[in-house]
């Protein structure tokens, strides 16, 4: 285990963040780092970033859905090998489609059904250009609830034979997972998360449907045009794009705070336990942090575990082997470093420089890693 040089950590992060603020690369941001059970860094940047500020998580919702699914796997109510049509017979007619002139054209039927494992590892056939078209064309009724959305995606199709390719699914795969969880538990997905993850982890501000008071704490969306900061586009009353708050989008729909998500990350670092409350078994967290996509399908320095990416090669450079975590379209980012007992969380909401390849996320990783001693 290598400890962080706290003085160096503060220097790295303060210099970087001030530079990004001055260049209008970020408008507001909140950072929190922990090592070996102790806070090592915590700071808010920008005029609106305060204790309790609420951020749109976007795809940093996915690890929460991953934990929810794996809790049911532990309870033997769900298996990674379960095909989707076990829960949704509609999927037995799902087509493989391609995009032609912004239309989806059927080109065949899959030989095998997508499974829970495929949904968690972005190998189900959902995603990419096909899902982009599906998202643009989804009708208001299909977009209104998670169950309606699952039926829509079952009819709209997948882009390839499951587990023959890797294609990031922004919403569809994890919407299907959330729908499956609702059917297994006979509970609304938001209620299941509250009772089984949020309440035990002390995540009191994590929600699909913010209250009026939480909306008042919501960080404004930022953008950057011609080197100048400007307001970013949002849809009134929606946490993620045009998804209504009645649709508990398992891939992108949650809002949360720095404090709440840090609790979630620390739970993962602690092997599934937070404040004496057991969410998952240590071996289940380890399974989530294990690559499940072969290098032949994903010859990269990071590969998909269950709902999160895992550093699998030393030439990744910015983080040690075995670190795992994920990001969001609006610039949120986190990782867990089991070897050095670190959790690090970066919150921002911006249409400039977001997603898994955000420059600010890469800089955050570099600045923390360069502060490790030895």
Residue ranges and their predicted role:
Residues 85-94:
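Acidic helix-start/capping segments at beta-turn-to-alpha-helix junctions
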Residues 335, 341-350:
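Short, well-ordered beta-strand elements
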Residues 11-18, 37, 56-84, 174-182, ...:
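Active-site SXXK
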Residues 94-321:
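Short, surface-exposed loop or secondary-structure junction motifs
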Residues 351-374:
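Generic C-terminus detector
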Residues 3-58, 77, 93-100, 105, ...:
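Short, conserved catalytic-motif segment at the N-terminal edge
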């Amino acid at each position: 285990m290598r400890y962080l040089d706290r003085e160096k950590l503060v220097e790295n992060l303060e210099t970087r963040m001030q530079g990004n603020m001055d260049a209008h690369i970020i408008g507001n941001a909140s950072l929190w780092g922990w090592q070996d059970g102790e806070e090592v860094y915590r700071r808010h940047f920008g005029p609106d970033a305060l204790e309790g500020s609420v951020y749109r998580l976007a795809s940093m919702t996915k690890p929460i859905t991953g934990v929810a699914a794996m809790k049911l796997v532990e309870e033997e109510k769900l298996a990674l090998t379960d095909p989707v049509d076990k829960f949704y017979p509609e999927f037995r007619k799902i087509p493989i489609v391609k995009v032609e002139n912004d239309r989806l054209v059927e080109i065949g039927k899959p030989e095998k059904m997508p499974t829970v494992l495929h949904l968690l590892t972005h190998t189900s056939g959902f995603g990419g250009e096909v899902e982009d078209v599906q998202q643009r064309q989804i009708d208001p009724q299909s977009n209104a609830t998670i169950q309606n959305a699952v039926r829509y995606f079952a009819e709209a199709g997948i882009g390839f034979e499951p587990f023959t390719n890797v294609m990031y699914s922004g919403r569809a795969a994890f919407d299907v997972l959330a729908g499956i969880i609702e059917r297994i538990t006979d509970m609304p997905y938001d209620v299941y998360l509250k009772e089984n993850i949020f309440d035990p982890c002390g995540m009191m501000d994590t929600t699909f449907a913010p209250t009026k008071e939480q909306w008042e704490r919501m960080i404004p969306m930022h953008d950057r045009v011609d080197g100048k900061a400007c307001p970013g586009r949002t849809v009134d009353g929606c946490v993620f794009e045009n998804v209504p708050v009645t649709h508990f989008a398992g891939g992108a729909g949650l809002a949360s705070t720095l404090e709440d998500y840090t609790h979630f990350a620390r739970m993962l670092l602690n092997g599934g336990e937070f404040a004496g409350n057991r969410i998952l078994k240590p071996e289940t967290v380890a399974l989530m942090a294990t690559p499940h996509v072969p290098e032949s399908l994903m010859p990269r320095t990071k590969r998909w575990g269950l709902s999160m990416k895992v550093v699998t090669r030393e030439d990744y450079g910015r983080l040690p082997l075995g670190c795992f975590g994920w990001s969001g379209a609006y610039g949120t980012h986190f990782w867990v470093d089991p070897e050095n007992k670190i959790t690090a969380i970066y919150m921002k909401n911006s249409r400039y420089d977001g997603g898994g390849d955000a420059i600010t996320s890469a800089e955050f990783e570099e600045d923390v890693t360069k502060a490790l001693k030895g």
